[in-house]
Amino acid sequence: MLGVIADDFTGASDIASFLVENGLSTVQMNGVPTQSLNSKVDAIVISLKSRSNPVNEAIEQSLRAYQWLKENGCTQFYFKYCSTFDSTAKGNIGPVTDALLDELNEDFTVITPALPVNGRTIFNGYLFVGDVLLSESGMKNHPITPMVDANLMRLMDAQAKGKTGLVAYADVIKGASRVQECFAELKAQGYRYAVVDAVDNSQLEVLAEAVADFKLVTGGSGLGAYMAARLSGGKKGTNAFTPTKGKTVVLSGSCSVMTNKQVEKYREKAPHFQLDVEQAIHNENYIEQLYQWVIANLDSEFAPMVYATVPPDALKAIQHQFGVDQASHAIENTFAKLAAKLKQYGVTNFITAGGETSSIVVQELGFTGFHIGKQIAPGVPWLKAVEEDIFLALKSGNFGKEDFFEYAQGMFL
């Protein structure tokens, strides 16, 4: 059984959707469960909020997740992080990878965030978003993890205790045996991690074969999909659900390039309310005002949207005025409390944009786990809470096409 430790919520639902699509029955747990799993599945995904919190917390959470997965029958483990890496020199990917390797008594693993279907590719160890380097993409303006270097070896070496080598494209296309030879060569030279080039899915397929016997694999959801395909014998997932029509709200906290486009497009069709950060910080009645506005607009043709999404210049101004931490906390807290009030009112469908926003909303709603439904876009499935008929679409910042919010609602039964 495959056990996945994901460093944020949207990342967890991202990989869970690819596992289901490729034939593995999968359950997604919100945080480390306190009880044993009582259903039979092929894979378990645990979502943590460990991407940008203090490193000791990230390690502690990840090791607890690993322990629970092991106790519940998992024999191979996958540390899932974002396809844009989202980890600076002070980041947690290196330290968590090291802690998991030590716990498993292993001394080598791969670093493969590639997700070609969404334009995330690796060549010569450099991570690309579409046709530009990660460091020249919108990710350089990320409010919490600005990505100013695209070289994955340097990024990993800056935050991990070992050395990072490269398995280059020219070797990967020779097949799994050659990739395994490269691993052996790197290990002999004292390397602890290998960045593996992948410019399209065929390289991920090769890599899935090459790491079939690894106890720990790390990467984005792309490699996970091909590992699932191997484990399931090429089965395809069936019977994925879509939500029932009901009261719906859109909550957008991401400031990514794509989410800005999605918000702009959706504003043309739906009632929308831009969250005011100063009000969120200082006005204790602000959540009530937002709540009243949303419920007044719930009968619109398209769901009302509350958004904190702004372009890079406006984001910098907000961060300069209020501080990064205070602004982020105020926005997340506002969305979380608003979501809780709306659920109480009878909203059953939540569409959220942004990893931090999604994580905090799910925590506030208090669900322990999710069934994985139909994909809205690659890496973004509909989820259904295990406790009740509440449906969520949790979108990582740059995922989805420009009509994402409208398209998601078009899937209602």
Curated annotation (Swiss-Prot):
The keyword Nucleotide-binding applies. InterPro entries: 4-carb_acid_sugar_kinase_N (IPR010737), 4-carb_acid_sugar_kinase_N_sf (IPR037051), NBD_C (IPR031475), NBD_C_sf (IPR042213), OtnK (IPR050007). It catalyses: 3-dehydro-L-erythronate + ATP = 3-dehydro-4-O-phospho-L-erythronate + ADP + H(+); 3-dehydro-D-erythronate + ATP = 3-dehydro-4-O-phospho-D-erythronate + ADP + H(+). Coiled coil: none annotated. It holds the Pfam family NBD_C. ATP binds at residues 254, 354-357, 397. It comes from the Bacteria. Its EC number is 2.7.1.217. Transmembrane segments: none annotated. GO terms for molecular function: ATP binding; kinase activity. Keywords: ATP-binding, Carbohydrate metabolism, Kinase, Nucleotide-binding, Transferase. Catalyzes the ATP-dependent phosphorylation of 3-oxo-tetronate to 3-oxo-tetronate 4-phosphate. Belongs to the four-carbon acid sugar kinase family. This is 3-oxo-tetronate kinase. It comes from Haemophilus influenzae (strain ATCC 51907 / DSM 11121 / KW20 / Rd).
